[in-house]
Every structure is written in structure tokens, then in C-alpha cells.
Amino acid sequence: TESGGVLYRGQSLILSVEAEGRNLSYQWQKNGVDLSAGTSATYTITQADPSLHDGNYSVVVSNIFGNISTSGVILSIIDVNSSFAGQTFHVKSAANMELIWVPSGSFLMGSPVGETGRFGDDEIEHNVSITNGFFLGKFEVTQAQYFSVLGGNPSDFINSQNPVENVSWLDVNSTFLPILNEQEQTNGNLPVGWNYVLPTEAEWEYACRAGSTTAYSFGNSISSSLANYSDYYSERTSLVGSFSQNTFGFYDMHGNVSEWVNDWVYYDIHDAPENFYTDANQSDPLGPSSGTNKIIKGGSHSKTENFLRSAAKDWRALGAKDNKIGFRLALKKSL
């Protein structure tokens, strides 16, 4: 593996070394101690376990003329059943993404009646439990990352490190995600049962709030020094990560581009958007089972501050796209 790579509990890994010369001998070491099974050019780890396999691996290559020791490779096994809140993991992939582990937990989703900018009945406060931790992109998906998977860039505001925009929910779910997951599975970068997906609205808001109960993750007010919104930046996107991160370590959860999530928006019997949930407790909510429009979260470079609130939601048709909408990926285990 490479520095910054990710290996999950239960995966296998082959460490290998290339050397020139005749009659070579190999001795793999972990933390400077010889490994009895490590006497060839490759060393295999099966069923990776943090308690057994975490460590600094190196190999000594020798023959009658002398020996040389390679520099070490630090191997850290991620136990996906443990809490790694706030830690960033670089996932070796074509898309070159950084992910943050979001641990399981509970939070108050929605907004209180008196919150400034509140939209109304589609934000009824209710307790939500996220029972399974998941990875979420540290940043919005960039144009460079999108290009690395699909070989194209639909964005209006061209810059490799700006968020990709002009992508519909269908573009993400019918094209980008299937290809990315196939690439990652083929390259052995995903453990069995794990896939890149869009987060649910509840997962997105949980990660956005990062323990906060205020209108925004950083308090009850917002300014142009905290986010790109309301035309303060010429109604265009900014480089991802241009503003401060939240407590969990996520950037641009407020502003820049609105972000697709997986949920349908709920309509009442009068075809008016309304909150799908009552004030009753919810566990891993998925939203309505069908609908017409999908939810977007976070507000954008051209939206006013009320759309940037953690609880706020907007919605668009599955095929809708413009330069105000992008996305952020989750990495989750199928249940």
C-alpha cells in the first residue's frame, strides 16, 4: 500500500519489492522484527486486523555481496466498526478523494419554530439516530475528480479544484456512481459490500451539524467570510475548501454549490412540499419511497442565507442541472 492509503478490516494485501541481482534473499520485517513467513519478494496479509497487522513494514534484500533495507511502509487497518470521527482518510482511487469517517450517533434534525429564515412545515424538529457510521467526502466532488472518472467536465466555472456543477441527480446516480464503483471494485479499493453513494438527507444534515444545534454549523449567523453565498463572490463557485471546516472536518457544507442527496421530497395531498417526518423519533430515515423531485442541501453561491441553514432543503427534478448544483459522496456498507 502507499502512504495515506486505506486498508479495511478483513481485506487482503500483498506487499512486494523489486530488486536486481543474483541469488537474492528476502526478509520482511514488521517494526524491525523478522516475519517468519516473509522470506520472498512478496508478503501477503490476509483478513487484515488492526491488532495483528498495524505497523511499519520493510524488507531486507541481500546476497553474498551485501544487503540493503527498504524504507518502511506504515500500514494502518481501519476498523469500520470503530469511531474515527474527524480523521481524514485518503482513498486510493481514480477520483483521488479524501473521506472523513462519521461515527454513529443521534441528533436533532430540522429547525426550531423560532429559527430565523425557517421555511416552515418541511423542517419539523425530530430526533434521528444514525446507527451505522459512514464515510463522507471532506470536500464537494471537484471537476478534476469528475473528469478522472468520466473523462468530461460539464461545469460552467472551469477550474479543476472548483466543485463540479451542471450535473443532475441522474448524471450522478446513473453514470458517475456506477462507473466509479466498478473502477474501485476492479482495482481492489473497496471492501466487499461497500459502495459510493449519495448520502441521505439525514446523513448529510448529521455531518453538516457536526454536533451543533444552531442554524449553521458555526452559529446562528453567517457572513461572506464563512461561506460563498448570495452573490458575494460574483455568483460563481469558489475553490473547494476556501472557507473554514466544521467540527467534523467537512468543508463547504454551507454555500458554494447545493448538494444532491438521495431522498425524494415529500408532497402533501395538496401537492405542497412538506416535511415527511413528524416529531417522532426516526432511525436511519430514507425519506419517501417515491416522488418527483430530489432534495438538494446546503445552498449555493447565488442563494440567500436562509437556504444555507443546516436544516434547509430545496429540490429539483431528477434531470435538472445548473451551475448551482453539485454533490458530495458517501462511502457506505450495504446492509
Describe every region a protein language model picked out.
Residues T1-G4:
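Surface-exposed, proline-enriched loop/turn segments that connect beta strands in immunoglobulin-like
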Residues E20-Q27:
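Solvent-exposed loop segments of extracellular immunoglobulin-like
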Residues K30-Q47, I158-N159:
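Surface-exposed, flexible coil segments in extracellular/virion-facing regions
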Residues D49-S58:
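Solvent-exposed loop/turn motifs of extracellular immunoglobulin-like beta-sandwich domains
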Residues K92-S155, V167-L170, G255, L329:
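A short glycine-rich, aromatic-capped structural motif
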